[in-house]
From Swiss-Prot:
Annotated segments matching region Self-association (with itself or N-terminus): 1060-1468
Protein name (record): Centrosomal protein of 290 kDa
Keyword Transport carried by entry: yes
One Pfam assignment: CEP209_CC5
GO cellular component, one term: centriolar satellite
Start and end residues of each stretch annotated as Disordered: 1130-1152
Gene: CEP290
Keyword Coiled coil assigned: yes
Species per Swiss-Prot/TrEMBL record: Bos taurus (Bovine)
Keyword vocabulary terms for this entry: Activator, Cell projection, Cilium, Cilium biogenesis/degradation, Coiled coil, Cytoplasm, Cytoplasmic vesicle, Cytoskeleton, Nucleus, Protein transport, Transport, Ubl conjugation
């Protein structure tokens, strides 16, 4: 039994172990499966998000190919653009060269004319020299007269030529301005359209932007989505881990349950055995019979049966339970499969959508890869607009400068002419033979008047010729226009005739068909006739019957013959008409060809005539006003001529219409006459045939009826029948012709009616056109009249301006110049006097200041003359002298500042004076140079006069102009140099006060840094003294202001006087000085405020906080050590725990809660300490800086002390040296001041180095208390915030708490097992409990880490808020000021960087911008080409209608050429 029991126990234990192992294995496999599924899903997501290598390589290849293609296209575009640019450049050069050629040719022509005039004059002189054989005196007189006349003639001719050139030039400029205006208008229109397009695009872009913004507002940012995804992944991982842990725990719990059930069963079986054994023992004790054995066995059987029944019931219940579980598992598996399928499909859909989205994104990227962003486009548009505006401005400036240049040239020429006239007058007045010269001039003037009259007559003749030629041209134009109209009409007529010809051909073909049919019919009739003739009348019949039959047949034949004859004639007439029409058409075509050829020959001749006339009209010498008047007259005349032409054309059309109608009427009449004649002829023929027939009939009747018909009779009959047949044929043909003629007549009537309607329509149209043209011409005439009135007004204004100019020029320039020079000299003298007065006043001020200082020092020293020892004086009077020395120092500083300001003003005034003197000297030099140049010019004039006496005045006006131009250029260069010097001086003047100001500020800062403690103590005592000093200084200021006001008044008067010379530099200088002074005052005020704040702050915060920081460090270290110790204790308690009793677990739970509380407390303390540390770290560098400053102060004071001691030693040594009493007194005073300073600084050092005074201690304690209160407030605030955070995060922790409670319940169930007394079972239970506890511990540690992490996050969030609450408002102010200063510096740096960036951007500008510009250029060129084509069409139309149009293309080309090349001014 024992063995069996042992084996039973072993097997049961093995079963238990096997079950546990199998369960564990199955759990592991399930967990592995779940983890694998999760990992596979994660990997699948990664794969879905990623792209395959093949696709990537494909995309890279496509990208590379696209980039290569794009590069090639760009290179090609660049090449094309370069080519087009080169071509345009060459075209422009060609045009400019052509223009230069033309200008050179014109100049050559002018020079030829001039040469011709000179040769004529020379020939006249030679003729006169040869012819005159008079006396010598007379010869000399005549020669001089001839020379003067010839000079004047040549001068007049030169003037004429110059005026011609001017007129041509003005005409060119007028045309150029017109074209430029047109271009500007076109450009404006284009810009407006572009602007409209841009606004539309901008609006669309704004809408799109708004849409995108709305979408963005609705959407989530990428960072948030990425964070959410990561969080989801982490949550999924944690979920999987928790599932794994739950499955493990379930397995453990299942195993424990099974073991408990097995143990219960074993216990029950043992109890039963014990009971059975007891009963057996009792039975044995009672009796040992066989009956008793049987009964016992029976009892045993009964008990076994009962146990079997119970076991069967249990088995059945277990089987039912199993069935239920299997059904439940099947359902769950079905649900799982369905869910997995749904998941699979959802994933598939998601992948497909993701792929589709990626593809769309890639395609969109490819589409919009090269697209420019809106910001860049806006930049480009802005830059374009700016460039265009700059270009327009530059163009305007160019035009203005050119106009000024021309006006100056004209003035110089006028001045030269006047100079020459004046020189002639002066020479005549100087000569003794003045009267003779006057007489000779009088004679010359009379001759010139005669010549003028002749020239006027010639001019009148020329004008008449021009008018005649204009009339001829207008006639030619009229003829050309009429011929063109005729050509057009003939072309139309020819086309109509061609159409008619085609129609007639078709009709003739039809007629041919008809004739063929008729022929066939005639043949049939002939056959019938033959048959009829063949069938003679029956001879059996009586003769009268036979005759009647014969007569009937003859009549029919005659009728047929007549008809055929008529048709034949009508056909012949039609043939003739058609032949005549053909001839006419051929003649018309030939005449048209001839006319066209003649016109082609005439057109170039007329063009040449027009050119000649234009050149002739250009050569006319008239001023601008006359020219404009003439142009207006010409245009009016042209318009009238056009009107006349139009009227003549209308008349011609009317005449043509009347002719056409007459022709139509004549044709109709002819047709009617022809019809009448035909009818008469037919009637005559019919009458003749009837009479003949009657005669023949009577002859037959008269003849005897008896004779038998012979062969002759038969022959006669046959002949008669033939004639009858012929007549019938002719009659039939005539009938057909009649029908045709009637049809033709009807057609002709229809055609004539149509033509009449067309002519009437034409007439109406022409009348309407004529009315419109008349209205237009009237409007143009009115416009031209307005223009005439305006031009007359302009001419009057020009005349008045000319008169004023003449009057202004008549005044002698030398006298004005002298007056100006004298004025300038007087102003200079006044300025020098003012300068001297100011310098005297300044010297007096300085002297007064020094005297006052000396008097104060003497008074100070005279009080202490009695005292011999310096040490005793220092000991007694330190306190008394302290305040006085400080006051004096302050006074000295103020006086120094006042001196510096006065010096600055002095410097500015001296600089102004120097500038004025320099300018005056420069102007005097320039005036001297001008005088010298004038003398040189006079000498050159004299030389030229001598040359002119030898030769005739030809092309020798050029050197003068060249010299003048060189002079002007030199003067301009000098002016530029002077301006640059002025600018430099102004910059230096601005720089000097800035440097002085910076140096002064540095000195003041250093001195005030040394005296910041003493100033606070002595401020109250010094207020009254300062007020007195302020009063004195205000008085001084008022006096100085009065002086300055006087100086300003004098300056204004001087400026008014000097306005004629244009001196305005003083004003600029004064304004700049005032601005600089204002800025200085503002900066001083700001400096003083800042210094006061800094001193206040330093007084408050000059506490050594090193001890506080050290205390905080020690506290931190102690707390950290405590934390470490607590953590170690925790770890020991976790591992070394007694595992026998269930009470320990409760203790452990309580301990854990206490530890958590302690941990929270420690973390809060840690946070506080960290805050304190951060504050200390922030204060550390400031305190270090303070210590450093104090050390430097100490060292500096030591050095000063040593120096003072050295000086004292020297003073003691040189007491008995050969110095005067006042010098010694001064030195003693200075020494006193130095010693007082040293004592003060020593006291300060003692205070600093020694223990803190009671007041400072009290302050420190107060601050400490404040800081503690703030710390407590912070703690409270932090506690509130943490409680808020914990409340918000309580929901998250509730789940973890619930899981913990569930685990604790399971732990309690496990602890019940610990009460079992057996050793093996308790050990296993303890191991399981350990596992469970470790799991719980690990979970709690995780919770703890999470809580710590959350606390740190909250600390980080609340960190900046908590650090703000600093008590000292002044510190905040100083910090604010410092930050403002830093921000200003940063802004400056930022601005500099931005400027550099902008420069770099300008240097490295995008090539796309230039490409856009080149595209615009290309478009512009294409538009120009289109414009040229349209202008050519316009020209053709204008030539057709005889309207003159100036081509805007030519004008634009001229404009471009003038832009590239300077304007070719005419040579005077």
């Amino acid at each position: 039994e024992r063995q069996l029991r042992k084996e039973n126990g072993k097997q049961k234990n093995e079963l238990m172990a096997m079950e546990a192992e199998v369960g564990e294995k199955i759990g592991r496999l399930q967990r592995f499966k779940e983890m694998a599924v999760f990992k596979i899903a994660a990997l699948q997501k990664v794969v879905d998000n990623s792209v395959s290598l093949s696709e990537l390589e494909l995309a890279n290849r496509q990208y590379n190919e696209l980039t290569a293609k794009y590069r090639d296209i760009l290179q090609k575009d660049n090449m094309l653009v370069q080519r087009t640019n080169n071509l345009e450049h060459l075209e422009c050069e060609n045009v400019s060269l052509k223009e230069q050629m033309e200008s050179i040719n014109k100049e050559l022509e002018i020079t030829k004319e001039k040469l011709h005039t000179i040769e004529q004059a020379w020939e006249q002189e030679t003729k006169l020299g040869n012819e005159s054989n008079m006396d010598k005196a007379k010869k000399s007189v005549t020669n001089s007269e001839i020379v003067s006349i010839s000079k004047k003639i040549t001068m007049l001719e030169m003037k004429e030529l110059n005026e011609r050139q001017r007129a041509e030039h003005s005409q060119k400029m007028y045309e150029h301005v017109k074209t430029s205006l047109q271009q500007v208008e076109e450009r404006n229109f284009e810009l407006e359209t572009k602007f409209a397009e841009l606004t539309r695009i901008n609006l669309e872009a704004q809408k799109v932007e708004q849409m995108l913004r709305d979408e963005l507002a609705d959407s989530v940012s990428k960072t948030v989505s990425d964070a959410d995804r990561q969080h989801i992944l982490e949550l999924e991982k944690s979920e999987m881990e928790l599932k794994v842990e739950v499955s493990k725990l379930k397995e453990i719990s299942d195993i424990a349950k099974r073991q408990v059930e097995i143990l219960n069963a074993q216990q029950q079986s043992r109890e039963k055995e014990v009971e059975s054994l007891r009963t057996q023992l009792l039975d044995y004790q009672a009796q040992s019979d066989e009956k008793a054995l049987i009964a016992k066995l029976h009892q045993h059987v009964v008990s076994l049966q009962a146990s079997e029944a119970a076991a069967l019931g249990k088995v059945e219940s277990v089987a039912s339970k199993l069935q239920k579980v299997e059904a439940h598992t099947l359902r769950l598996e079905q649900k799982l499969d369905e869910k997995e399928q749904a998941l699979f499909y959802a994933r598939l859909e998601g992948r497909n959508r993701a792929k589709h989205l990626r593809q769309t994104i890639q395609s969109l990227r490819r589409q919009f890869s090269g697209a420019l962003p809106l910001a860049q486009q806006e930049k480009f548009s802005k830059t374009m607009i700016q460039l265009q505006n700059d270009k327009l401005k530059i163009m305007e400036e160019m035009k203005n400068s050119q106009q000024e240049h021309r006006s100056l040239k004209n003035k110089t020429l006028e001045m030269e002419l006047k100079l020459k006239g004046l020189e002639d007058l002066i020479s005549t007045l100087k000569d003794a033979r003045g009267a003779q010269k006057v007489i000779s001039w009088h004679t010359k003037i009379e001759e010139l008047r005669l010549q003028e009259l002749k020239l006027n007559r010639e001019l009148v003749k020329d004008k008449e010729e021009i008018k005649y030629l204009n009339n001829i041209i207008s006639e030619y134009e009229n003829t050309i226009s009429s011929l063109e109209e005729e050509i057009v009409q003939q072309n139309k007529f020819h086309e109509e005739r061609q159409m008619a010809w085609d129609q007639r051909e078709v009709e003739l073909e039809r007629q041919l068909d008809v004739f063929d049919r008729q022929q066939s019919e005639i043949l049939r009739e002939a056959q019938k006739f033959e048959e009829a003739t063949g069938s003679m009348p029956d001879p059996s019949l009586p003769i009268p019957n036979q005759l009647e039959i014969a007569l009937r047949k003859i009549k029919e034949n005659i009728r047929i013959i007549l008809e055929t004859q008529a048709t034949c004639r009508s056909l012949e007439e039609k043939l003739r008409e058609k032949e005549s029409a053909l001839r006419l058409a051929e003649e018309n075509i030939l005449s048209r060809d001839k006319v066209i050829n003649e016109l082609r020959l005439r057109l170039p001749a007329t063009a040449e005539q027009e050119k000649l006339l234009a050149e002739f009209s250009r050569k006319e010498v008239e001023p601008k006003s006359h020219h404009t008047l003439k142009l207006a007259h010409q245009t009016i005349a042209n318009m009238q001529a056009r009107l006349n032409q139009k009227e003549e054309v209308l008349k011609k059309y009317q005449h043509l219409l009347e002719k056409a109608r007459e022709e139509q009427r004549e044709i109709v009449k002819k047709h009617e006459e022809e019809l009448h004649t035909l009818h008469r002829k037919l009637e005559l023929q019919a009458d003749n045939s009837l009479s003949k027939f009657k005669e023949t009939a009577w002859d037959l009747i008269k003849q005897s009826p008896t004779p038998v018909p012979t062969n002759k009779h038969f022959i006669r009959l046959a002949e008669m029948e033939q004639t009858v047949a012929e007549q019938d044929d002719s009659l039939s043909s005539l009938v057909i012709k009649l029908k045709q003629v009637s049809q033709d007549l009807e057609r002709q009537k229809e055609i004539t009616e149509l033509k009449i309607k067309e002519f009437e329509n034409m007439k109406l149209r022409l009348q309407e056109n004529h009315a419109d043209e008349v209205k237009k011409i009237k409007a143009e005439v009115e416009d031209l009249r307005c223009l005439l009135v305006q031009s007359q007004k302009e001419s009057q204004s020009l005349k008045s301006e000319l008169q004023t100019q003449k009057e202004a020029n008549s005044r002698a320039p030398t006298t004005t110049m002298r007056n100006l020079v004298e004025r300038l000299k007087s102003q200079l003298a006044l300025k020098e006097k003012q300068q001297k007065a100011l310098s005297r006043a300044l010297l007096e001020l300085r002297a007064e200041m020094t005297a006052a200082a000396e008097e104060r020092i003497i008074s100070m020293t005279s009080q202490k003359e009695a005292n011999l020892n310096v040490q005793q004086i220092v000991d007694r009077h330190t306190k008394e002298l302290k305040s006085q020395i400080e006051d004096l120092n302050e006074n000295i500083l103020k006086l120094k500042e006042a001196l510096k300001t006065s010096k600055n003003r002095e410097n500015t005034l001296t600089d102004n004076l120097n500038d004025l003197t320099n300018e005056l000297q420069n102007k005097q030099k320039a005036y001297g140079k001008v005088l010298r140049e004038k003398d040189a010019v006079d000498q050159e004039n004299n030389e030229l006069k001598r040359q002119i006496k030898r030769l005739t005045s030809g092309l020798q006006g050029k050197p003068l102009i060249d010299n003048k131009q060189s002079l002007i250029e030199e003067l301009q260069k000098k002016i530029k140099k002077l301006e640059s010097q002025l600018e430099r001086k102004v910059d230096e003047a601005e720089m000097k006060p800035m440097k002085e100001k910076s140096a002064r500020e540095e000195v003041i800062r250093w001195e005030e840094g040394k005296k910041w403690q003493t100033k606070i103590e002595g401020i109250r005592n010094k207020l009254k003294e300062k007020e007195g000093e302020v009063y004195i200084l205000t008085k001084q200021l008022t006096t100085l202001k009065d002086l300055f006001a006087k100086a300003d008044k004098e300056k204004l008067t001087l400026q008014r006087k000097l306005k004629t010379t244009g001196l305005t530099v003083d004003q600029v200088m004064a304004a700049r000085v005032l601005e600089s002074e204002k800025e200085l005052e503002e900066l001083k005020k700001r400096n003083l405020d800042l210094e006061n704040d800094i001193s206040y702050m330093r007084s408050h915060q000059a506490l050594p906080r090193d001890s506080v920081i050290e205390d905080l460090h020690l506290q931190n270290k102690y707390l950290q050590e405590k934390l470490h110790a607590l953590e170690k204790q925790l770890s020991k308690d976790a591992y070394s725990r007694p595992s026998t009793s269930g009470i320990d677990s409760d203790d452990h739970y309580q301990r854990e809660q206490e530890l958590q509380r302690e941990n929270l407390k420690l973390s809060s303390e840690n946070i506080e300490l960290k805050f304190q540390l951060e504050q200390a770290n922030k204060d550390l560098p400031r305190l270090k800086n303070q210590v450093r400053d104090l050390k430097e102060m100490c060292e500096f004071l030591k050095k000063e002390k040593a120096e003072v001691e050295r000086k004292l030693g020297r003073v003691r040594g040189s007491g008995r040296s050969g110095k005067t009493i006042p010098e010694l007194e001064k030195t003693i005073g200075l020494m006193k001041k130095v010693v007082e300073k040293v004592q003060r600084e020593n006291e300060q050092l003692k205070k600093a180095s020694g223990i803190l005074t009671s007041e400072k201690m009290a302050n420190i304690e107060m601050e400490n208390e404040k800081l503690k209160a703030e710390l407590e407030k912070l703690k409270v605030h932090l506690g509130r915030q943490l409680s808020m955070h914990y409340e918000s995060k309580a929901k998250g922790t509730e789940k973890i708490v619930a899981e913990n409670e569930r685990l604790r319940k399971e732990l309690k169930k496990i602890e019940i097992l610990k009460h079992v007394p057996e050793g093996d079972e308790t050990e296993q239970g303890l191991q399981r409990e350990l596992r469970v506890l470790r799991l719980a511990n690990s979970q709690l540690e995780k919770e703890k880490e999470e809580l710590i992490h959350r606390i740190e996050i909250s600390k980080d969030q609340n960190g900046p808020d908590s650090t703000i609450s600093d008590p000292d408002h002044l510190m905040e102010k100083i910090k604010d000021l410092e930050t403002q200063l830093r921000t200003s510096d940063m802004e400056k740096q930022h601005l500099k960087e931005e400027i550099q960036k902008l420069k770099k951007e300008l240097e490295n500008f995008d090539p796309s911008f230039f490409e856009e510009i080149e595209d615009l250029k290309y478009n512009y060129k294409e538009e120009v080409k289109k414009n040229i084509l349209l202008e050519e069409k316009l020209k053709k139309l204008s030539e057709q209608f005889g309207v003159e149009l100036t081509s805007p293309v030519a004008a634009s080309e001229q404009f471009e050429d003038e832009q590239e090349n300077p304007v070719n001014f005419p040579i005077y």
